[in-house]
A protein has these predicted regions:
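Nucleic-acid enzyme cleavage-core boundary/entry regions
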Residues: 1-243, 252-364
């Protein structure tokens, strides 16, 4: 299965190169057709509850100098990817940016430019960057709980790991590639997943043994979650019907972490169905919690208030719950961290707060 994925990716890239060659062979100015990935071509699919690319297409042509440079960079990148697949190597996105220093006129001016080109190739081919042997700098999440996975290590050996019994307090680190050829989910002994924004709160729940008392899988998101984290959660939800609850701070940016997990992000709209878990439930801090528990707070910044107002028209936050909580947060002009619950002691979050919220959802 692994080789088939990589062979398919190579064929897709070779088809692009052949098309450019054939255009040049006929004396035409070469061009590529690519999906438009601007905000105007991204729609929220109410049917699937995820962000999706629209049908608008654009052209990258050598007619202008900048377009010619981008086509040259594209060809260099495709060659680099093919070489990695042949050599059974992989590269970080950062390494690929520096590799381009040897491409003379085709070198990238910024890493953002090289990252976007890799995303364009994903959108054009329907392949994933994992199929291209490209990986991000950041690690995936830490997880702890009663699930058993089988991971293929760098030597090609299969290793079975129980993510509760075979790991230390820091948990199991999710690799950048969590597809079935790399990672198999062998057994699931948890009732639900709880995705936690901050490391401090993840450690609190681990120390309090919440994974065992609630029979859950704890996942540390590390802020905005990495793609591998979202994909890992999606696989558990889709393949094993494990519900997802998201526990974050109470501010507009944390609300967007929930939205990214549940409905996808605009930037990766072309793969939202592959990453998003639309059935996710929110159990994070709300404006109502701030008032009901009299939590320590900070004042909203102008940026916070602007982001909250934008969320009122964001289709990911439709429904009375989000409308009420966002409007209330704007009204009280306050935000709070999830660790503010420590006001009531170190056990309050696991003895009272989460059991109450999860109980309302029928998860505990």
């Amino acid at each position: 299965m692994t080789e088939a994925r990589y062979e398919s990716a190579q064929k897709e890239l070779e088809d692009i190169a052949k098309d450019i060659y054939q255009q040049m062979n006929k004396g035409k100015i070469p061009s590529m057709t690519i999906p438009v990935r601007t905000k105007g071509n991204i729609k929220f699919s109410r049917k699937n509850s995820v962000w999706k690319l629209g049908k608008s297409m654009g052209q990258r042509s050598a007619k202008k100098l900048n377009g010619a440079y981008m086509l040259l960079r594209t060809l260099h990148m495709m060659e680099f990817i093919e070489d990695m697949i042949d050599q059974k190597k992989s590269s970080t996105l950062r390494e690929m940016y520096y590799i381009s220093e040897g491409w003379e006129h085709a070198k990238f001016s910024t890493q953002n430019e090289s990252n976007k080109l890799a995303e364009d190739l994903e959108a054009i081919t329907g392949c994933m960057r994992e199929d291209f042997k490209l990986r991000p700098e950041e690690d995936g999440a830490r997880v702890i709980g009663d699930i058993t996975i089988e991971e293929v290590n760098r030597k090609g050996e299969k290793k079975k790991i129980n993510c509760r019994d075979d790991v230390g307090d820091s948990g199991y680190g999710i690799p950048y590639n969590v597809e079935k050829d790399k990672l198999k989910i062998k057994s699931v002994g948890v009732d639900f997943i709880i995705a936690i924004e901050t490391g401090g709160m993840f450690d609190r729940l681990v120390e309090n043994g919440f994974d065992e008392t609630s029979n859950s899988l704890l996942v540390h998101l590390k802020g905005q979650p990495a793609r591998s984290t979202r994909r890992f959660i999606k696989r558990l939800n889709e393949e094993h019907d494990v519900p997802l609850a998201v526990f974050t701070d109470g501010d507009p940016w944390s609300f967007r972490i929930f939205a990214s997990l549940a409905f996808g992000a605009i930037k990766t709209a072309y793969i939202s169905e592959y990453l998003a878990t639309p059935t996710a439930e929110y159990v994070g801090i709300t404006a109502s919690d701030i008032l009901n528990y009299e939590l320590p707070t900070d004042k909203l910044s102008d940026q916070d208030a602007s982001a909250l107002r934008a969320e009122l028209s964001d289709p990911r936050f439709k429904g009375q719950f989000w409308k009420n909580e966002i409007e209330l947060m704007l009204q009280i002009n306050k935000k709070a961290e999830q660790q503010a619950l420590a006001k009531y002691g170190l056990d309050f979050v696991t003895d009272k707060y989460l059991p109450d919220k999860l109980g309302e959802l029928g998860l505990m």
